[in-house]
Amino acid sequence: DAGASGRARVNLNRFDLAMLKPFMPEATQASGVFTGNADVSWDTTKEGLPQGKVTLSGRNVKVTQVVNDAPLPVAFDTLNLSADLHNNRAELGWLIRLTNNGQLDGQVQVTDPQGRRNLSGNVNISNFSLAMINPIFARGEKAEGRLNARLRLGGNVKSPQLFGQMQLSGVDIDGNFMPFDMQPSQLAMNFNGTRSTLQGTVNTRQGQIAL
């Protein structure tokens, strides 16, 4: 019995992802080590949710997923995750740096999780290379280009809103599934609440397609 009120602290020391192998599908492999800690307090005699914070940090983490009978490896230089619940606000944060690739970072807040559940926060993608997915393509097919995004969250959990821009620069996808021979192109997706617009120019050997 945890009692009507109390506090718990837990440390996670060198949790090896190999221990999860029996619970993973055959097409997924994971390696690396996680460390972290959790600090949670509760008081059932008062209204509201428990208070607490959880942090996780990965080291030498690598995930390989088999897609179309080909392995797609993803290695992480940095993999930090955090979750916090204090003062009637829940927050999730992340910082992910891919080996020889870009960075993903951001945070999402939910204010009044038991009531209005208002959303705020941001999602950032920096210099992410599409070439990472080339291992799953057939011979002669490829993807190139860089993805960058600066996005902001709004609205609430029931009706989320997204603001900002996502850009693809130098994007060039060659494959039998493409209806034309694509050349390096520029694309941008602009988000304004519940609406979005696609802009840019797709270059082909036959000319340009303006969006």
Task: Name each region found by the language model.
Residues D1-R152, V157-L211:
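Interface amphipathic segments
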